[in-house]
């Protein structure tokens, strides 16, 4: 029996027993039962499970039988009966096949062959192609359109954050993730950015639920704002819903929304779609990918993922499930593109743990302050483990850090021995070398705990010589300048600062190029759609698909507002739908738009001059004033001649208006 090299996720047909090498270099297949009918073979080729591209030529060589095999004509019982003449019966038959195997490309009835199968097996590829075209034509004449699934991209494309996607099939819709984004530097006074929910509100009767892949802000941050407009059931893993629950309490929605806990490996039914949750590795526990089983075919959404063989918490990503889906036939793969520019593999979380061990030894006489993402529970667990090992107490700083860690401890995702965690107010009662402070601010956020420490604005923590600061995070694109400013300020105060580019104190939670190619290789999708990234990330990810042989017509690089329709025959772009961004400023949601931002920018750049004057309504003479008030324009005490000249000009204009009997307020302003 020939030992065929293949990846372990690759599967040969169920009736394959082995193969024997013969003199001319070919292989003879041993099967439980040979299927030699030409018609049957065509049908099998149409419905065969996809084969891994690396071994496809070898696989085809193995399954093609030689002349010497199967000299006997096929059994009549293995031949499909001719299609019934009744039009209704034929349509019913097609419908039955669709319900059993919705992912298959062709569903047609075949007449019984008049000749034995071996005589038909020599037909050329052109003849087979003609036969397939006839099948397609037959299908079209049935008058029934193949089921399709639509995807609406309302966020997460050409940007980092604000992930928000809708899928629709046969009148049923589901939402995948509902995240927020951080404001850019030109969004003055804006707290956060959320998706535009107009399209959701218009289709509320079709939407069956919200599916969350994990608990990061760019995937759950906008949930409260959406649920204030529409009441929908939410599905997610325990930690993800624990974080959502905290947000609902802040917004007064707790108890008004149905939260449904699911676990990896479980499935739910929403309308015509079945959704299976698949365990993946990420920088937060309880992250999942999604397999969406629809009448049109299987959609795989990876969520945020990487392949980590030694994760800090939990198990390795369930590659077996993704491979199983690939063997069933995946219509489309929607995959994380964040690290598509980075070659190789993402480093394992175990490397960070080893770095912490070395740095704790190096800073044995210093107070250690570590800034990381509040949601990175596994990273905090590693810090706590090192603190326990080296006899240090742990304190937390930052509102989000306290909230997330509280949820983590309550739900059992954090293991903190008794007596290790202390209140921030008590840190000065212990020697510096006995303290580890875990804080927010790894992205240089203006009001974060680490930023306030750097600018001596923190009420409880004062940093200086003797402090060893570790920034255990990589700057999000766009935050490099603010992070650099914080590092500079800390160093000016005498702190020793360690960050990612000089030490392995952070690893990404997103897959790099080789992992992304592996995901495409085992899922073997018909269509590929890169998501979760800026334009450069999406295009680089698409380039990886091209390098693996994917045709450009089967790859879609989208933008916010795009709509896409997919089925077994085609992928086409639909007219755009309402989408965009909504700015949140304090309690105001959507009050700030482009015009307000433009005015704020002008005020910030040019300053403000206001003229205050009281004018009599009757004859228009000046009752009091004018007073000229300036903010951000010039320093008044050093510019008194300029301000006096401004008052003189205002008086002159008002006197001219009074002489010409102009009392209209709008005219005076102009």
Q: Model segments located where?
A:
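His/Asp/Glu-rich metal-coordinating catalytic cores
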Residues: 125, 129-211, 216-430, 448-462, ...
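Intrinsically disordered, low-complexity RNA-associated tracts
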Residues: 21-143
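Acidic, Ala/Val/Gly-enriched low-complexity intrinsically disordered segments
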Residues: 1-3, 14-17, 28
């Amino acid at each position: 029996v020939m030992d065929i090299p293949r990846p372990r996720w690759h599967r040969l047909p169920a009736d394959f027993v082995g193969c024997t090498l013969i003199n001319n270099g070919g292989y003879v297949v041993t099967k439980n039962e040979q299927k030699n009918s030409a018609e049957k073979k065509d049908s099998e080729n149409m419905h065969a499970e996809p084969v891994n591209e690396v071994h496809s030529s070898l696989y085809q060589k193995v399954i093609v039988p030689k002349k010497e095999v199967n000299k006997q004509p096929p059994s009549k019982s293995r031949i499909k009966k001719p299609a019934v003449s009744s039009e209704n019966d034929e349509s019913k038959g097609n419908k039955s096949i669709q319900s059993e195997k919705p992912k298959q490309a062709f569903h047609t009835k075949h007449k019984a062959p008049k000749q034995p199968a071996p005589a038909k097996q020599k037909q050329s590829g052109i003849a087979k192609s003609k036969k397939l075209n006839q099948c397609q034509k037959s299908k079209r004449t049935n008058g029934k359109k193949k089921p399709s699934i639509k995807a609406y991209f309302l966020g997460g494309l050409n940007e980092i954050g604000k992930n928000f996607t809708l899928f629709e099939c046969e009148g049923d819709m589901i939402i995948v993730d509902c995240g927020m984004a951080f404001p850019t530097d030109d969004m003055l006074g804006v707290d956060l950015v959320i998706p535009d929910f107009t399209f959701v509100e218009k289709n509320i009767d079709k939407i069956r639920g919200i599916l969350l892949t994990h608990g990061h802000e760019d995937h759950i941050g906008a949930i409260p704002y959406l649920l204030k407009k529409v009441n929908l059931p939410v599905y997610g893993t325990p930690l993800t819903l624990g974080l959502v629950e905290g947000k609902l309490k802040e917004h007064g929605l707790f108890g008004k929304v149905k939260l449904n806990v699911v676990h990896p490996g479980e499935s739910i039914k929403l309308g015509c779609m079945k959704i299976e949750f698949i365990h993946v590795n990420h920088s937060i526990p309880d992250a999942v990918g999604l397999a969406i089983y629809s009448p049109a075919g299987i959609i795989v959404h990876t969520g945020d993922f990487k392949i980590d063989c030694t994760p800090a918490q939990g198990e390795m990503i369930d590659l077996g499930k993704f491979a199983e889906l690939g063997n069933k036939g995946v219509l489309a793969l929607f995959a994380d593109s964040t690290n598509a520019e980075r070659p190789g593999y993402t480093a394992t979380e175990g490397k960070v743990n080893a770095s912490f061990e070395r740095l704790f030894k190096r800073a044995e006489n210093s107070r250690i302050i570590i800034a990381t993402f509040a949601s990175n529970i596994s990273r905090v667990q590693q810090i706590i483990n090192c603190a326990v090992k080296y006899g240090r107490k742990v304190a937390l700083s930052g509102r989000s850090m306290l909230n997330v860690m509280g949820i983590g401890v309550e739900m059992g995702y954090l293991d903190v021995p008794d007596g290790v965690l202390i209140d921030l107010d008590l840190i000065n009662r212990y020697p510096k070398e006995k303290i580890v402070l875990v804080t927010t601010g790894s992205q240089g956020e203006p009001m974060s705990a680490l930023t306030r420490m750097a600018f001596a604005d923190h009420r409880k923590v004062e940093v200086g010589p003797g402090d060893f600061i570790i920034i255990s995070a990589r700057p999000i694109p766009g935050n490099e300048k603010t992070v650099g400013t914080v590092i500079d300020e800390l160093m000016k105060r005498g702190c020793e600062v360690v960050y990612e580019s000089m030490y392995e104190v952070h690893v990404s939670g997103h897959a790099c190029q080789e992992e992304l190619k592996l995901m495409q290789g085992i899922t073997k999708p018909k269509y590929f759609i890169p998501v979760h990234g800026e334009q450069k990330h999406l295009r680089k990810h698409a380039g990886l698909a091209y390098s693996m042989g994917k045709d450009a017509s089967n790859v879609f690089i989208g933008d916010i507002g795009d709509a896409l329709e997919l089925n077994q025959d085609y992928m086409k772009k639909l007219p755009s739908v309402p989408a965009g961004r909504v700015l949140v400023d304090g309690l105001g949601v959507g009050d700030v738009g482009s015009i307000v931002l433009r005015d704020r920018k002008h005020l910030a750049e040019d300053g403000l001059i206001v003229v205050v004057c009281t004018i009599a309504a009757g004859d228009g003479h000046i009752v009091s004033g004018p007073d000229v008030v300036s903010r951000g324009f010039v320093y008044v005490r050093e510019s008194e001649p300029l301000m006096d000249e401004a008052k003189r000009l205002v008086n002159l204009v008002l006197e001219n208006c009074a002489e010409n009997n102009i009392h209209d307020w709008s005219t005076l302003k102009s």
